[in-house]
C-alpha cells in the first residue's frame, strides 16, 4: 500500500509526503461499521491515498458507540493491514469535553492526556500530525506551542497543526515560533469549499476561510487541509429536482446556486462530476491545499479521487480558482 509519487505533496517544514486528498474518518466505527470502514480505507490505499484524518472525539456524540471509535477503528485497520509506515495519520485533540462542555481544553494536562490517548488508540506513538481541534483565545499562544514542543520532544507526536484558529492567532503562533526557534504549526484545518455556508450557520468556535485567513496563508505559505471541502455533497444534491435537502440547506444561497450551475456545465464538458471539479479548483489554488473528503462508499471515494485526473484549461482553472478565493 504505497501512494503514487505523482500525487504526493511534501508539507513544508516536515518530511511528510501526503496524497493530494486526505480521507476524513469522522464516520469510522459509527455511521460506517468496522467492515465498511476497512473497505473504504482499503479503496483509499489502492487509489494511492496515504493521508487519513481523524480525531479523539469523533462520533463520541453518537449513542451506543465505542468512545473514540474513529481512532480505534483506524488503529485496528493499520494493524490488520500492516501499513502504518505507509500512511500519514493525522488526529486532533484539545476539543471541549462533550459531556461537560465548559470551554477549551488547551491546558498542558489536557493536551498531554489527549495526545497519549490518541497514540494508544492508533496503535502507538508517534502520531504523524497532531491538530489542536479548537483554539482557546484566552490562553497565550506561546504556552500552547511550548506544550506541543514537549510532545514532539517526547516522541508522542511528530508535527503539530492548528484547526479552527483565527488569522490573528495563527500570526501570533508564527511570530512566537520564529522568535523561539521552533517549528510551530505546519498546517491549518478549517472549513473551505466552493460553496460558502450562510454566515449564521458557522458555529462560533469553528472557522471558515475568509479574506484575513487567506492573506495569512498567502504570506506565510502555510498549507491548508480543509474539511467540508465537498460542501457535504451540495453540488450534486442541488441538481436534483425538488427542495434542497436539509443536510445541505446551510449552503442554499443564490451565489452557491450559480456556482453549482457553472460546475455542472463544466462537468459535462470534462466528463466528470461537479464535486470533483470543486475539489480540483481547491487543489489548483496558489497555496498548498489538501482537501479532506468524506465518503460513505468506495464509489463516492473514486469519484472524488478522479479530480486528480482532471486537466482544466488555463481559463477554466483560473475561473474556478477565482471562486475559491472570493468568499
Where are these regions (language model features)?
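N-terminal binding-site loop/beta-alpha segment at the start of enzyme catalytic domains
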Residues: 1-86, 229
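A short acidic, helix-capping loop that chelates divalent metal ions and anchors anionic groups
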Residues: 58-62, 96-102, 196-200, 303
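Short beta-strand segments at enzyme active-site cores
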Residues: 51-55, 88-91, 126-131, 161-162, ...
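Active-site mouth loops of central-metabolism enzymes
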Residues: 25-35, 97-109, 133, 138-139
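Active-site groove signature of glycoside hydrolases
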Residues: 119-140
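Short, acidic/polar
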Residues: 32-44, 107-122, 171-175
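Acidic (Asp/Glu)-rich catalytic clusters
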Residues: 13, 45-46, 77-88, 119-123, ...
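Beta/alpha (TIM)-barrel catalytic core signal, keyed to glycine-rich beta->alpha loops juxtaposed to Asp/Glu
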Residues: 135, 139-327
Amino acid at each position: 500500500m504505497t501512494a503514487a509519487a505523482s500525487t504526493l505533496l511534501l508539507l513544508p517544514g516536515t518530511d511528510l509526503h501526503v496524497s493530494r486528498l486526505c480521507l476524513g474518518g469522522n464516520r469510522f466505527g459509527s455511521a460506517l461499521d468496522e467492515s465498511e470502514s476497512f473497505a473504504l480505507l482499503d479503496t483509499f490505499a489502492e487509489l494511492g491515498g496515504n493521508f487519513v484524518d481523524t480525531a479523539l472525539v469523533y462520533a463520541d456524540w453518537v449513542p451506543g458507540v465505542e468512545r473514540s471509535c474513529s481512532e480505534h477503528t483506524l488503529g485496528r485497520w493499520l494493524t490488520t493491514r500492516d501499513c502504518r509506515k505507509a500512511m500519514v495519520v493525522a488526529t486532533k485533540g484539545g476539543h471541549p469535553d462533550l459531556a461537560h462542555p465548559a470551554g477549551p481544553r488547551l491546558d498542558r494536562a489536557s493536551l498531554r492526556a489527549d495526545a497519549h490517548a490518541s497514540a494508544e488508540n492508533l496503535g502507538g506513538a508517534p502520531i504523524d500530525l497532531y491538530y489542536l481541534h479548537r483554539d482557546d483565545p484566552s490562553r497565550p499562544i506561546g504556552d500552547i506551542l511550548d506544550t506541543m514542543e514537549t510532545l514532539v520532544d517526547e516522541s508522542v507526536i511528530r508535527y503539530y497543526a492548528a484547526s479552527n484558529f483565527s488569522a490573528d492567532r495563527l500570526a501570533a503562533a508564527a511570530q512566537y515560533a520564529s522568535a523561539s526557534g521552533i517549528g510551530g504549526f505546519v498546517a491549518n484545518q478549517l472549513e473551505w469549499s466552493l460553496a460558502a455556508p450562510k454566515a449564521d450557520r458557522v458555529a462560533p468556535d469553528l472557522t471558515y476561510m475568509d479574506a484575513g485567513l487567506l492573506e495569512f496563508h498567502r504570506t506565510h505559505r502555510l498549507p491548508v487541509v480543509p474539511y467540508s471541502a465537498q460542501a457535504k455533497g451540495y453540488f450534486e444534491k442541488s441538481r436534483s429536482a425538488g427542495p434542497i435537502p436539509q443536510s445541505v440547506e446551510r449552503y442554499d444561497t443564490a451565489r452557491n446556486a450559480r456556482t453549482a450551475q457553472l460546475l455542472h456545465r463544466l462537468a459535462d464538458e470534462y466528463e466528470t462530476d461537479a464535486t470533483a471539479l470543486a475539489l480540483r479548483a481547491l487543489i489548483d489554488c496558489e497555496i498548498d491545499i489538501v482537501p479532506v473528503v468524506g465518503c460513505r462508499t468506495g464509489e463516492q471515494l473514486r469519484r472524488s479521487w478522479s479530480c486528480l485526473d482532471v486537466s482544466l484549461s488555463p481559463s477554466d482553472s483560473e475561473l474556478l480558482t477565482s471562486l475559491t478565493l472570493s468568499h
